[in-house]
Amino acid sequence: MRAPLGPAEIRRLLPHRYPFLLVDRIEELEPGVRAVGVKNVTQNEPFFQGHFPGYPVMPGVLIVEAMAQVGAVGVMAVEEYRGRLALFAGIDGVRFRRQVVPGDALRMEVEIDRLRGRVGRGRGLAFVGGERACEAELMFAFAERGEESR
């Protein structure tokens, strides 16, 4: 699988759907190593209705989720993991450096530094216009579909 990936290719790798699919395209992809993706943040995002009326700001937890989805594309592009679910196992060192607002292109870079069996870890960075918006260590566990509620 080679970048760039558009919405159809992303949906083949991830189970997320609107309104919770938070990646519009994957610009760079090294399966199991690294992925770079973009979310074009529009005024029409459903979360802006309540966060915050008159002062729309993308919730920080959704920035972290978007980074995790980019990382999941990087993992799910590896044949061994395709079709599994990547579930959050932990989030460390989260820092928000800049607000993300309508009109921003949120560029997310995830380096996967551990991928072994049923667990993985990556370092996510998110930028708007070259300015760092967020950073986090992302830990995840893999489940077979149908196993995630156990």
Curated annotation (Swiss-Prot):
GO terms for molecular function: (3R)-hydroxyacyl-[acyl-carrier-protein] dehydratase activity. The active site is at H51. It is found in: Cytoplasm. It catalyses: a (3R)-hydroxyacyl-[ACP] = a (2E)-enoyl-[ACP] + H2O. Its EC number is 4.2.1.59. InterPro entries: FabA_FabZ, FabZ, HotDog_dom_sf. SUPFAM superfamilies: Thioesterase/thiol ester dehydrase-isomerase. Gene3D superfamilies: Hotdog Thioesterase. Keywords: Cytoplasm, Lipid A biosynthesis, Lipid biosynthesis, Lipid metabolism, Lyase. Pfam families: FabA. GO terms for biological process: fatty acid biosynthetic process; lipid A biosynthetic process. GO terms for cellular component: cytoplasm; membrane. Its main location: cytoplasm. It comes from the Bacteria. Involved in unsaturated fatty acids biosynthesis. Catalyzes the dehydration of short chain beta-hydroxyacyl-ACPs and long chain saturated and unsaturated beta-hydroxyacyl-ACPs. NCBIfam families: fabZ, PRK00006.1. Belongs to the thioester dehydratase family. FabZ subfamily. This is 3-hydroxyacyl-[acyl-carrier-protein] dehydratase FabZ. It comes from Rubrobacter xylanophilus (strain DSM 9941 / JCM 11954 / NBRC 16129 / PRD-1). The gene is fabZ.
